[in-house]
């Protein structure tokens, strides 16, 4: 069975545990196939993989042409499944996606994917970034902990994810008030924000601790003053010019401001409640560094 795969996909044995080509590989454990990662292959069906259905834990396909996924239901030992920028001759499988009882991580990336109807009690991590999916309404994954849905048309959370802790979104025009459907959200990563966008809606997440807005168009802290539970804010490579509003964020403990146009930190007052502050060293005077030390603020700096 394995010899057929070696011949068809031009795989060479490079060690006791790996068969590899220039773009793809198969991993073995105790002479059993446990992982398949194929790139830019033409895969007529999953029939070639069926002899290993009882041992396969991970299948990742990248830029592959896929014709028939009907046998996916037989891979009941899978923990990780990924279709990254693949081409599908038939996308009907996404209208009633196979329930794989041990699957923990599902990655579906590609503009051809327009819809997803799935029920799973096992999946904990889902990525549907860079798809054409517009709604989450038919995604029923009650134990989901991490969701990535950047660069797609989704503008709101319209399904309940009671255990979700980590979320990646394209924030421009996203309805942040819809985060009420993620009551246990802890970490939010937001990309492609619009200028002067308010994050008031995210205040519905009363357990939100971490917010990353790397390289976004914010000039001060007023958009975040209602995030009372926030403890860590990462605004690196953004457009922060002043600390206005920061003094209102009483529970904030860690702030990262590397790569922002703000010139100098002239007062201890806006940052005195922080435990850790990251910024270029030349923007903090020796006097301010002494004040930070007096307030037990850990100064994380770079020399640039």
Residue map of PLM features:
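LRR N-terminal entry segment and analogous cap-like coil->beta motifs
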Residues: 5-85
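Plant-biased, solvent-exposed loop and capping regions
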Residues: 1-8, 13, 50-52, 95, ...
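Periodic aromatic/glycine/histidine/acidic cluster detector
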Residues: 26, 199-200
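Concave beta-strand-loop units of leucine-rich repeat
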Residues: 36-43, 60-66, 77-90, 102-114, ...
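Hydrophobic anchor residues at the C-terminal helix/turn of individual leucine-rich repeat
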Residues: 49-51, 72-74, 94-97, 116-120, ...
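Positively charged, hydrophobic/aromatic-enriched amphipathic segments
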Residues: 1-20, 117, 137, 158, ...
């Amino acid at each position: 069975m394995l010899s057929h795969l070696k011949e068809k996909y031009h795989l060479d044995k490079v060690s006791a545990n790996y068969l590899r080509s220039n773009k793809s590989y198969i991993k073995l454990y105790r002479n059993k196939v446990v992982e398949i990662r194929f790139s830019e292959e033409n895969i007529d069906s999953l029939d070639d993989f069926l002899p290993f259905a009882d041992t396969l834990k991970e299948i990742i396909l990248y830029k592959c042409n896929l014709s028939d996924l009907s046998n996916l239901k037989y891979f009941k030992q899978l923990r990780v499944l990924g279709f990254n920028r693949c081409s599908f001759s038939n996308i009907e499988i996404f209208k009633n996606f196979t329930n794989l009882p041990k699957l923990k991580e599902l990655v579906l990336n590609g503009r051809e994917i327009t819809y997803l109807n799935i029920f799973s009690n096992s999946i904990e991590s889902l990525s549907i970034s860079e798809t054409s999916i517009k709604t989450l309404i038919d995604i029923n994954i009650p134990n989901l902990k991490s969701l990535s849905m950047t660069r797609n048309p989704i503008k709101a959370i319209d399904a309940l994810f009671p255990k979700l802790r980590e979320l990646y979104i394209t924030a421009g025009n996203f309805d942040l008030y819809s985060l009420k459907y993620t009551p246990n959200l802890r970490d939010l990563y937001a990309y492609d924000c619009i200028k002067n966008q308010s994050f008031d809606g995210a205040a519905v997440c009363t357990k939100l601790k971490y917010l990353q807005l790397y390289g976004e168009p914010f000039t001060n802290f007023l958009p975040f003053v209602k995030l009372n539970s926030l403890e860590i804010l990462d605004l690196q490579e953004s457009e922060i010019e002043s600390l206005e509003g920061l003094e209102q964020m009483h529970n904030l403990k860690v702030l990262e401001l590397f790569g922002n146009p703000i010139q100098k930190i002239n007062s201890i007052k806006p940052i005195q409640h922080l435990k850790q502050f990251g910024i270029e060293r030349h923007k903090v005077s020796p006097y301010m560094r002494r004040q930070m030390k007096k307030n037990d603020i850990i100064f994380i700096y770079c020399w640039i």
